[in-house]
Swiss-Prot record:
The keyword Cell cycle applies. Belongs to the MinE family. Transmembrane segments: none annotated. It comes from Cupriavidus necator (strain ATCC 17699 / DSM 428 / KCTC 22496 / NCIMB 10442 / H16 / Stanier 337). One of its GO terms (biological process) is regulation of division septum assembly. Keywords: Cell cycle, Cell division. This is Cell division topological specificity factor. Prevents the cell division inhibition by proteins MinC and MinD at internal division sites while permitting inhibition at polar sites. This ensures cell division at the proper site by restricting the formation of a division septum at the midpoint of the long axis of the cell. Gene3D superfamilies: Cell division topological specificity factor MinE (3.30.1070.10).
Length: 84
């Protein structure tokens, strides 16, 4: 971030904010201190809101799931994007 951006109060892009939130959630999950997948509904709503700014999708067009096997966690996001 440049000094000009800081002084003028330029806002971050919503995609970078969403990316930062995902990184925080994943880092928090790796420490093992959070409840299992309590954040998934909120994450799904936020992702729909961000993606809807660029592509017309509904709540049912995006699915978020978290799978755990041994020491591996997979956060899967499926998005159905209309062809038009």
């Amino acid at each position: 971030m440049s000094i000009l951006s800081f002084l003028l109060g330029e806002k971050k892009k919503s995609a970078s904010v969403a990316k930062e939130r995902l990184q925080i959630i994943l880092a928090h999950e790796r420490t093992g201190h959070s409840a299992p997948a309590d954040y998934l509904p909120a994450l799904q709503r936020e992702l729909v809101a961000v993606i809807s700014k660029y592509v017309k999708i509904g709540d049912q067009d995006l699915r978020v799931s978290l799978e755990r096997q041994d020491n591996l966690e997979v956060l899967e996001v499926k998005i159905e994007i209309p062809q038009n």
